[in-house]
């Protein structure tokens, strides 16, 4: 409803009460968070990691068509660093109360300076009306800290330009109790496993010096049996083993 419509109706119906007019005007108000109705999401990120959190809000049945997304970001840094987001638990859209439904997580990592040497994995904080003891982070009192371990999985790049990596972060999520969420601090920290492994099983074979790539079986991706080893390119060099290139 536009302001022109409101005031046109006001002149047609002079008997409108001020309280009713205020209600109509509130129906056209801008989206706003509700006071101190927030929780804190904070934690630690490794060097060369970034984090984006997208809070998704939805309305009740009478406002089922309404929704809102709020985005929070922590950029890359060369050293380990912390982040802290103040996330509203609810928003008001006119006469509709929009409640936090979930927080989508995008965990970014980079392993080089080139544009293609950046990737991400996903996580999620799901807000539920009633959580169970199995959820772990929803018991009475302060929620337990959440720890996610990220691993780098390597492979030959599709264009044979070098080694490309895929980021895999385990445990980047939880179920949060809506009633216990207000004014709480949820701690979600990330670490990196120093051990890298191949993205696909049985495509590289591990030796004490590192990983050696092997030729695949015909029509398959896995190594031949017995394995036949090959070279690969990385940083404009012909390499036989990863990560040191040469034995």
Model-derived segments and their meaning:
Residues 12-22:
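Sec-dependent signal peptide recognition
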Residues 131-247:
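A eukaryote-biased signal for long
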Residues 51-162:
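Structured domain cores in non-transmembrane regions
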Residues 8, 19, 210:
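Alpha-helical and His/Cys-centered functional microenvironments
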Residues 26-27:
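C-terminal motif of bacterial Sec signal peptides marking the signal peptidase cleavage site
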Residues 39-50:
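Structural motif
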Residues 30-34:
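Short, solvent-exposed beta-strand/turn "edge" segments of beta-rich domains on protein surfaces
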